[in-house]
Amino acid sequence: MDLFIVLVICLSCLLLVSLLKQSYARRKLPPGPTAFPLVGNVLQLDRKNISKSISMLAKEYGPVFTVYFGTKPSVVLHGYEAVKEALVDHGEEFSGRVTVPVFDRYAQGAGLFASQGELWKETRRFTLTVLRNMGMGKKTIEDRIQEEASCLVKALKETNASPCDPSSLLFCVPCNVICSIIFQNRFEYNDQTFQTLVKHFLDSIRLFNTPWMQLYNTFPILHYLPGSHHELFKVFNDQMKFFSEKIREHQESLDHNNPRDFIDYLLIKMEKEKHNKQSQFTMHHLLVTIWDVFDAGSQTTSSTMQFGLLLLMKHPEIAAKVQEEIERVIGRDRSPCMQDRSCMPYTDAVIHEIQRYIDMVPNNVPHAVTQDIQFRGYLIPKGTHILPSLTSVLYDEKEFPNPEKFDPGHFLDASGNFKKSDYFLPFSIGKRACAGEGLARMELFLVLTTILQHFTLKPLVDPKDIDPTPVDNGFLSVPPSYELCFVPV
């Protein structure tokens, strides 16, 4: 009985502390829905479609408001003006990164995703420099993507127009492009090592986008309980072992005067800084950076392609117009190239509309403020989590009339020319914008046009019965599983 009383008193104290902390914080933070002790607003949000819940809250509280995930407040930025004002006009102050417990367990503040301050700035600057040296934005990387697109066509022809799930093959394309940058070589799709690498990344995507992992990131204490996070950490460990072996191979054959790939550049950077006790370019940092480049360079691009094929099957009239433009501009005798894009406004508009419509990262990768800041009349304390709602920008009704409709006309003017939009932010904006945006744009254009140059997409059901709704709309929009037939043209 005495123990029970002690437990009740302890729980009551925890609730009281939680209430007092929330009450004090709310005096300065933007308004928002009333949060419950300990769990915050978690029970008031639709886990499968957080962006929809946020849109409803924005109608009540305005473009800047506060929600609590557990006991931690997150300031939501809703609409283009609020997002731009924070991430661009106050870019430095909003350039921090939230600690995501599941990532922090293995990253420990290292890499491109989880690092902060000067380490992040130096890592991002170094990564972009190396990627440019490796040919990003140049003909050399375009050649690699074209080669990979040709290999994909060969693999798709081997399906003999039979029903197939395209997810694994579509993941192989950007993954192999990244392999050529990181390791200097690509893999055959049936290579067992490559198959294992692809499986690990697909498993990590599947596991991370589960309800349990969202709960884990809100309540890290769950780490000590059974759950799928243990399986995810095993996948991470297997990936790190693979990368460690690749690094060891590179160390044995490293030529400081002739770097071959991303790993060589990182090893040379480490060697130059080995006498600098302040340097954070450690082996662990190298490993996590490689993982981050792989993940960012493969996951969202392949998922966008999966969504793209699904949407083109649902709208065969749009796919037919793209194929007409491909036939007129490129023909059948050569591979698509980036120079073609300026002559293919409809295809360009379709690819932009795919990215807008699928809303790949609805609430962006969470930011944090790097210092106390006055923003729109509110004091946001240093370290506060920031959720920029990209959904609210990509689905802005004034910029994109009928945003719920898949319509390439959103990116075409009255004359049928391609029309840019400042609201097109699938890669985010500001200092933490996706470092691989240029690479992703090239891959999407070259791979999708190459597929449609060689195949007609045949669904297994009536197009009107195709449902492109994501199976999960939490951190990432995950495409539903489906099969189709790639019929040679």
Swiss-Prot record:
- List required co-factors: heme
Keywords from the named record? Endoplasmic reticulum, Heme, Iron, Membrane, Metal-binding, Microsome, Monooxygenase, Oxidoreductase
Q: What does this protein do?
A: Cytochromes P450 are a group of heme-thiolate monooxygenases. In liver microsomes, this enzyme is involved in an NADPH-dependent electron transport pathway. It oxidizes a variety of structurally unrelated compounds, including steroids, fatty acids, and xenobiotics.
Keyword Endoplasmic reticulum in record: yes
The record's GO CC annotations read: endoplasmic reticulum membrane
> Gene symbol?
CYP2C30
The positions annotated for binding heme are: C434
Q: Which GO terms describe its molecular function?
A: heme binding; iron ion binding; oxidoreductase activity, acting on paired donors, with incorporation or reduction of molecular oxygen, reduced flavin or flavoprotein as one donor, and incorporation of one atom of oxygen
Q: What is its EC number?
A: 1.14.14.1
**Which EC main class describes this enzyme?**
oxidoreductase
**GO BP:** organic acid metabolic process; xenobiotic metabolic process
Q: Where in the cell is it found?
A: Endoplasmic reticulum membrane; Microsome membrane
Q: Which reaction does it catalyse?
A: an organic molecule + reduced [NADPH--hemoprotein reductase] + O2 = an alcohol + oxidized [NADPH--hemoprotein reductase] + H2O + H(+)
Q: Name one Pfam family in it.
A: p450
Q: Topologically, how does it sit relative to the membrane?
A: Peripheral membrane protein
The UniProt record describes its induction as: P450 can be induced to high levels in liver and other tissues by various foreign compounds, including drugs, pesticides, and carcinogens.
Which Gene3D superfamilies does its entry note? Cytochrome P450
Q: Family, per the entry? A: Belongs to the cytochrome P450 family.
Official protein name in the record: Cytochrome P450 2C30
Per its UniProt record, what InterPro entries does this chain match?
Cyt_P450, Cyt_P450_CS, Cyt_P450_E_grp-I, Cyt_P450_E_grp-I_CYP2A-like, Cyt_P450_sf, Cytochrome_P450_fam2
